[in-house]
Amino acid sequence: REIRDQIVDFDTIQDPHPAGLTLWKEGHEGSLEARFYSIKSFPERFALWQMGSLIGDLMQPALQYSAPFLLTMGVHVLDPNVMKSVVTANHVRATQNARSKMAEVMPDVGKKLQDWTAAANAIDVGSSLVSLYHQLAIFSPPEKAVSAQETANAIWRGRGFQLNADVYMHRQALLASLPMTLSEAFY
């Protein structure tokens, strides 16, 4: 059966535990474990067009998901008026820090100045800034959940990301994974 049929039925029972949600039905053998992950750290450079590489590698079996998965990206366009003042303040602060004597011992000051300069330039030409998230959900039999988790970690680590298990936040993560659920109330 498809995952949508297992989750949507009203008689599906969700049992939360630290690693994820166990989905099952009374009187039916077998269960499904859903585990959810957020991104803990991003690579320094990674364009959205490269996201296709996060669904696995066709040529390397070790970098192929061993269970059904759901990869979701949520994008929230930030208020341009509010962001203009925030970006301006942070850009001024980054410029001051880059010109200070402490800049020599703080290597990330130059990178922060570049980031805030790019954000300020984008706002100056009428662009908007966004806040986004990625959510990964893996659906597997409980006995294969650890293996599926390790495979997902290997795929994402190979692209420079570090995944973070959403421990004790499974239902929120499930809602964040579903399409068309991102709204003001959920953001």
Labelled PLM ranges:
Residues R1-F186:
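Extended, folded cores of ATP/NTP-driven motor/assembly subunits in large transport
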